[in-house]
Amino acid sequence: VKDPNFKAIRNDGPTRLGHTILYDELVEIADTPIVGIYHADMYLCPGALESVLEHIKPKHVVSLTRIEPPLHPEGPEKILMDFGIEPEEFVKLEDELLNQIPSLKQGRTTEGIFAPWFLFKEDFTSINGHDPLFAPQSKEDTDIFNRFHLNGYKFVQTWDGFVYHMTCRGSRFADGAKRNPNGEVFMKNRETDEWLTQNNRSTRNFLRKWGHYCKHDSLMKPIVPPKYDVEFNVENGNGKLLEILEPWCDKIKMDLDDDIINKYIEKEQVDTDFDLRSRINVNTNSDIEIHFDGNKLTEYSYKLITELSTILESSEIEVGEFEFDIFRVNVNRVKT
């Protein structure tokens, strides 16, 4: 490429860095005041960047509206229209898409964020960009969106600027999208083993950092419950329960043999930057201690654990003790 404005980074390996790392390296070498996170399977529609510039301000993150083929469930934050799932299909339908763009413009904005998104470079670097905890990929986007939200950034999605997003590229669907003989697109159960493994790893690290699953409203604005300092004190624990419960708290106590704990740490530590030895069976004075019997843990009880941050927030907890379901909760301090 001979364009003097084009800059690129090449990872010669052997370690896969992924976009969690490489996005930030690209931002670092960018010499423009505004930067954007953009997927390689997106087609920038005419007028899109002009719409970004219309709305960009300090501490504002501007997203374009995605036009997508019906590969994923519909939602109010995007437009489902099929102009092809592969470049070879798209080039035959490109003119049809371009003819549709004027009628798709809505002259409005909504509050949400999804790629492609744009902001001032200073606003990206001031919160240290993406967290390498989630490298090479998965959950790094929700993590940075949460931090934008907590730092008071405003989310703007313009409905006058569009990309056509083919979706389903990269490691999740290594072979791209597929059509059956009837021309219908199918994606279910086609994720690669690599993606499934990394997604599980990143999800567990996201839970350790935030204490809840990824949350957002219907227009993709982040929902960020408070993060409490929580300790689980589990009677009748076992190695499987340790694996299930450890990411959901900051500290966990179980009466387990050292070899069970060591085996878990040996297996799990390679997948996280969190020091697991400082989280398991250590003497600390946690803000919130939750006691329960592992033998009584049901599917419903586990669901309550997954919503613990929201439950504690809605309960307007104070120092003291209370119970719900199988859980006895001691609140020593209330901090988030």
Regions found by a protein language model. Give the residues of each.
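Active-site donor/metal-binding and catalytic loop motifs
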Residues: 69, 158-190
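A recurrent flexible, glycine/aromatic-enriched loop bordering the glycosyltransferase active site
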Residues: 98-121
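Short beta-strand-to-loop acidic/aromatic patch adjacent to the donor-nucleotide binding site
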Residues: 32-43, 286-294
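Acidic donor-binding segment of Leloir-type glycosyltransferases
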Residues: 1-14, 256
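Glycine-rich, basic loop-to-helix element that forms the pyrophosphate-binding segment
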Residues: 12-30
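Conserved donor NDP-sugar-binding/catalytic core segment of glycosyltransferases
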Residues: 47-86
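A short, conserved alpha-helix in the catalytic core of glycosyltransferases
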Residues: 112, 116-117, 123-128, 134-162, ...
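Acidic donor-binding/catalytic loop of UDP-sugar-dependent glycosyltransferases
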Residues: 42-55, 296-305
